[in-house]
A protein has these predicted regions:
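Glycosyltransferase donor-sugar binding loop
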Residues: 41-44, 219-238
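Donor nucleotide-sugar binding/catalytic pocket of nucleotide-sugar-dependent glycosyltransferases
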Residues: 134-179, 188, 250
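Conserved donor-binding/catalytic core segment of Leloir-type glycosyltransferases
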Residues: 188-204, 210-221
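Conserved acidic donor-binding segment of nucleotide-sugar-dependent glycosyltransferases
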Residues: 312-321, 328-332
Length: 367
């Protein structure tokens, strides 16, 4: 069975969905039961080239003018199933990704879709992908409950199947010497290394890091893509860091590879995720850090308090005093990392995808 994954972004491009697609492709290849390819834009690197995974790159802006070229490239690869990921950073507001299912449906190629977020696109585009889906996968629980009745009817047998995602962070077990070297790179001796990493948007609550941490004792490291010239929110973060009390106590690293992000998180005294909507099972960066044994502070709407199994303290969103107190009490506390947990999770995900792919081919034969 030949499976072609389609994604606008792919490592080393900064995109959570792109990283997810790379992890899924690698897990599918490891089953030794599929031929797996990825169609993506220029700039992608195939870090699994020796495994049998094929990454096809195409100069592409994902606009109307690219639709024919995308479709021809897909058909040339001769997939049994095309699996499109929605959305990705590279798609932006362009329309071609949303019309690919219709083009492939006319060519008789089954299209599986994964919806990583609730679909905010224009009404007719949501209708287009829903009407042309062979099967739909979602990574958020209770997704179907958010859908209108008419939309469920439109999906028919393609109604969403929930397959939880898993951390894309590389497993990391540092020696004490390796951890110390990383700490020395970011934090002066005697200061707590307090880290946030990921995308920086207002709903992530990154600005609260400057209220939770203490510039007298903490070195704040914010890892992720920064564009103060193009983002008013990023400018606001840069202004906070430029304040006299934070000027020497803040570092912006820019975008880090999965390996470097994992090493930084594993070396921290605390990693904080102050999301305004709370974390969920779909937040792979949070799940990944919680396997490293490092102390984590995360916001949540449905649970609060300390989880000893993952060394995580949960607070209500925007409860800055609680997050500040947790940092003071628990910074530097570590537990043994959950070695093997990430690999096992992706093996499960690959098995569930293969079952769905086979069912998709069976439903096509039955029509």
């Amino acid at each position: 069975m030949r499976i072609l994954l389609v994604t606008g972004s792919y490592p080393p491009m900064p995109c959570g969905v792109g990283s997810y697609t790379a992890a899924l492709a690698a897990a599918l290849v490891r089953t030794n039961s599929l031929e797996v390819g990825v169609l993506t834009g220029e700039g992608a690197i195939n870090s699994n080239s020796g495994s049998g995974l094929e990454v096809v790159t195409l100069p592409c802006r994902w606009g109307w003018g690219d639709l024919g070229r995308l479709t021809r490239t897909i058909r040339k690869w001769k997939p049994d199933i095309v699996h499109v990921q929605y959305p990705t950073q590279a798609y932006g507001d362009r329309s071609a990704p949303w019309l690919i299912p219709a083009m492939l449906r006319m060519a008789g190629i089954p299209v599986v879709q994964t919806w990583h977020e609730f679909m905010p696109r224009a009404h007719w585009l949501r209708v287009a992908i829903a009407a042309m889906a062979t099967r739909v996968i979602v990574v958020r629980p209770n997704y179907e409950a958010s859908m209108a009745r008419w939309f469920k009817k439109l999906l028919g047998q393609a109604r969403p199947q929930y397959i939880p995602n898993a951390p894309v962070m590389e497993p990391c077990e540092l020696t004490d010497i390796e951890r110390q070297r990383i700490r020395e790179r970011y934090a002066p001796a005697g200061r707590n290394l307090v880290v946030y990493f990921g995308f920086m948007y207002p709903h992530k609550g990154v600005e609260q890091m400057f209220e939770i941490a203490d510039p007298e004792r903490d070195q704040l490291v914010i890892a992720g893509h920064m564009d103060p010239a193009g983002s008013s929110y990023h400018r606001a973060l840069a202004d906070l860091a430029a304040a006299p009390k934070w000027r020497r106590a803040t570092t912006f690293t820019g975008y880090l590879t999965e390996k470097n992000a994992s090493d930084l998180a594993a070396s921290a005294d605390a990693v904080i995720f102050p999301f305004r909507d709370g974390v969920g099972s779909w937040n792979t960066s949070v799940a990944g850090v919680r396997t490293l044994g490092v102390f984590v502070i995360a916001t949540a709407r449905e649970r609060q308090g300390y989880d000893a199994e993952t060394n995580t303290f949960f607070c209500a969103p925007d409860d800055i005093p609680a997050m500040r107190a947790a940092l003071r009490q628990q910074a530097g506390h570590r537990i043994p990392p959950s070695s093997g947990a990430i690999t096992e999770a992706w093996e499960r995900i690959a098995r569930e995808h293969i079952i769905l792919y086979r069912e998709s081919l069976g439903s096509r034969s039955a029509r």
